[in-house]
Amino acid sequence: GHTIVNTDVALVPIALNDAWGKKIAGITLQDIKLTPYHNGVKQKAHKGKVLFTHFGMSGPTVLNMSKEIGEMIQYGDVTIMLDLFPKLDHSALKKELQTLLVEGSNKRLKTVLATLMPLALVTALLTLLKINGDTPNHSVRSEDRTAIITMMKSVPLHVSGLLGSEKAVVSSGGVALSEVNFKTMESRVIP
């Protein structure tokens, strides 16, 4: 008979431990960078689209990296750092934020930040940072601006696991590929 390779989920949404993530369920972010850390060691980054859900996150980029995450989580902790603005380095983002705060000096902090990202995400991040979003922009402290920029460049997400096979788009494993003729899809083992 055929050799069977262990089956596993390959393209599947990622579950998160972060309770605040539920507050941003339904938000889709485009062109962000996701960098996984396995036991504190940086891994290969991925860029693209992410959808936040009530359990964690999904979307093309997340699905594409889920197999790697699944392998990593078997051997330790996995944290994914989100860079919400990968096209801007830290200093360029600082300059952009400073310009927005000056231009809208009488507006509230969360109103100006909502021009850069969805309001629900702004609210969640400011809550994590313990910064009052209703603060007028002219009163935002320098250390708060620095904390906001740092957070926008590295939002930590703590992975609890992958959703099961019932949520997987694709699974891996099954009949060993070396035992199948790809041109005809016939077995090489059983004539």
Regions found by a protein language model. Name each.
Residues T3-D8, V12-S139:
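An anion/pyrophosphate-binding glycine-rich loop and adjacent beta-alpha core
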Residues T123-P191:
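A glycine-rich dinucleotide-binding beta-alpha-beta segment and adjacent secondary-structure elements
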